[in-house]
Amino acid sequence: MLQIALPNKGALADGAVTLADEAGYNCRRRGRELSVRDPDYGVEFVFLRPRDIATYVSKGIIDLGVTGLDLTYDSGADVTHVLDLGFGAARFCYAAPKSSDLTPDAFTADTRIATSYDTLVRRDLEQRGVDARVISLDGAVEISIQLGVADVIADVVQTGRTIDEAGLATIGAPILNTEAVLVAQNGHTMEKDAAQHFAERVKGIIVAREYVVVEYDLPEEHLPEARKITPGIESPTVSPLNKDGWVAVKAMIERESVNAVMDDLTELDARGIIVTDIRTCRM
């Protein structure tokens, strides 16, 4: 049975369960279960600390895992990056008091940096050629500056609200742009049918979130221009209507372009423009 690790708590937990659920798997826990089996598809979902998932996968204890890219890199685990999952986007940044003029390029051996991501920070400092002091904390690093423990923090920033409320601001460019990822031990893991099916299903959900289907009726004389606006994946579907000189067109378009596409189609005298969400797809 294929074992897939999902985060048991934290910002990535809900997104991971929702994604697997939408992909057709039974993965929802009743209470605080440590694992859930889906015998129909030969999969067991194991709920682990997000920080530990890449390590379990790298040792072959778990076949696949959903965790953060930041946590994967910080663990130092040797895993294969299978897919970006499209949720949990954040930046891993340095932050300092808003009144500070300190920048990463000005770090010295006396600069104290509090973080829960020792490996990521040490790697960045090494690339900068700086031997600053890294202070390892297990969460809630924002308060460390106020308590006089650190001069700077390095942490994951999503909205920025938490560091703003702590009187801090990010400094320098992000060390890493992170999001949820699917990881495997090695390429051989993905040769398993159950692993391939899971990855393909999840990929279908991710793509479906990025695209919609647009349908419209159009004077046939404007079809060449319409094809440029809605080219589809391979080609738009074009069908004749029971009205001379008119056709029905159907195509996938990027979700973020919906309103601009509708504006352009309206200028071509398109009628009955309908946009439909896609639940899942295979490209």
UniProtKB/Swiss-Prot annotation:
<keyword id="KW-0547">Nucleotide-binding</keyword>
<keyword id="KW-0479">Metal-binding</keyword>
<dbReference type="Pfam" id="PF01634">
    <property type="entry name" value="HisG"/>
</dbReference>
<dbReference type="Pfam" id="PF08029">
    <property type="entry name" value="HisG_C"/>
</dbReference>
<dbReference type="GO" id="GO:0003879">
    <property type="term" value="F:ATP phosphoribosyltransferase activity"/>
</dbReference>
<dbReference type="InterPro" id="IPR013115">
    <property type="entry name" value="HisG_C"/>
</dbReference>
<dbReference type="InterPro" id="IPR020621">
    <property type="entry name" value="ATP-PRT_HisG_long"/>
</dbReference>
<dbReference type="GO" id="GO:0000287">
    <property type="term" value="F:magnesium ion binding"/>
</dbReference>
<keyword id="KW-0028">Amino-acid biosynthesis</keyword>
<keyword id="KW-0368">Histidine biosynthesis</keyword>
<dbReference type="InterPro" id="IPR015867">
    <property type="entry name" value="N-reg_PII/ATP_PRibTrfase_C"/>
</dbReference>
<keyword id="KW-0963">Cytoplasm</keyword>
<dbReference type="InterPro" id="IPR001348">
    <property type="entry name" value="ATP_PRibTrfase_HisG"/>
</dbReference>
<dbReference type="InterPro" id="IPR011322">
    <property type="entry name" value="N-reg_PII-like_a/b"/>
</dbReference>
<dbReference type="GO" id="GO:0005737">
    <property type="term" value="C:cytoplasm"/>
</dbReference>
<dbReference type="GO" id="GO:0005524">
    <property type="term" value="F:ATP binding"/>
</dbReference>
<comment type="pathway">
    <text>Amino-acid biosynthesis; L-histidine biosynthesis; L-histidine from 5-phospho-alpha-D-ribose 1-diphosphate: step 1/9.</text>
</comment>
<keyword id="KW-0328">Glycosyltransferase</keyword>
<keyword id="KW-0067">ATP-binding</keyword>
<protein>
    <recommendedName>
        <fullName>ATP phosphoribosyltransferase</fullName>
        <ecNumber>2.4.2.17</ecNumber>
    </recommendedName>
</protein>
<dbReference type="InterPro" id="IPR013820">
    <property type="entry name" value="ATP_PRibTrfase_cat"/>
</dbReference>
<keyword id="KW-0460">Magnesium</keyword>
<dbReference type="InterPro" id="IPR018198">
    <property type="entry name" value="ATP_PRibTrfase_CS"/>
</dbReference>
<comment type="similarity">
    <text>Belongs to the ATP phosphoribosyltransferase family. Long subfamily.</text>
</comment>
<comment type="function">
    <text>Catalyzes the condensation of ATP and 5-phosphoribose 1-diphosphate to form N'-(5'-phosphoribosyl)-ATP (PR-ATP). Has a crucial role in the pathway because the rate of histidine biosynthesis seems to be controlled primarily by regulation of HisG enzymatic activity.</text>
</comment>
<dbReference type="GO" id="GO:0000105">
    <property type="term" value="P:L-histidine biosynthetic process"/>
</dbReference>
<keyword id="KW-0808">Transferase</keyword>
